[in-house]
Regions:
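Conserved interaction-surface patches within small, structured recognition/assembly domains
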Residues: 166-168
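Beta-rich carbohydrate-recognition and catalytic domains
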Residues: 1-91, 100-159, 170-213
Length: 213
């Protein structure tokens, strides 16, 4: 289980282990601060663990991927999903739910932030990674797929739609996304996984260039 802990230098990603969700063993920090919005992939790649996380480096808040043979020594750090100047996710991005394995690739659900004169707006976007080489981004949504509705504009932090976890029911094909509303409530959004993947596959790959849509 990855989680955010705190230090004198800022938040950082830490790890705990469990076999039954009754007893937990704290392993401690995985990466140095400032870092958060992290998740391990549910399987290894060529013997290596893979971690998606969001460090803050010289003010930049991009999504990175890193690899480790033992959950202790991390390297091969790469920017996975950068912010996009002028877009809805231009100022900050971060992982939301855990990576979900699908026949088309790893489904990534992330939050993107645009700062405006009236405050920040947090919305939800999607990406698709290669199944065996998850550092390769196959598709990325042009537009956000979930944003604050009028009734979600009020709370401790207005204008926030923050994805935190997801469940995919293979039998029904239903994807349930749980998300924070204005840092005050928890909501759930339901979609058909086939429709989600069909939309993503209609988006251009980053290598093909991106437009504002």
């Amino acid at each position: 289980i990855t989680y955010v802990s705190f230090s004198g230098s800022g938040p950082l990603v830490s790890l705990m282990l469990t076999e039954d969700f009754k007893e937990f063993t704290r392993i401690g920090p995985l990466v140095p601060p400032e870092d958060k919005d992290a998740s391990l992939f549910p399987r290894r790649f060529k013997g290596r663990y893979a971690l998606i996380h969001r460090p803050i480096i010289r003010g930049a808040a991009d999504i990175w991927i890193s690899f480790s043979p033992d959950l202790t020594h991390w390297g091969d750090h790469q920017v996975l999903l950068p912010t996009r100047p002028g877009w809805w996710d231009c100022h900050r991005v971060g992982l939301g739910a855990q990576p979900i394995e699908t026949p088309e690739g790893w489904l990534i659900i992330y939050h993107g932030v645009r700062m405006t004169a009236s405050g920040s707006i947090y919305r939800v976007g999607l990406a698709l990674l290669d199944l065996e080489e998850p550092w390769r981004v196959q598709r990325r949504s042009d537009e956000w797929v979930l944003g604050p509705k009028p009734y979600e504009q009020f709370g401790d932090v207005p204008g926030v739609t923050f994805p935190t976890g997801a469940i995919f029911e293979e039998e029904t094909g239903e994807l349930r996304l749980y998300y924070g509303i204005a840092d005050t409530m928890v909501g759930v959004a339901i979609a058909d996984m086939d429709e989600v993947l069909s939309y993503l596959l209609s988006c251009p790959s980053p290598a093909e260039g991106e437009s504002h849509g």
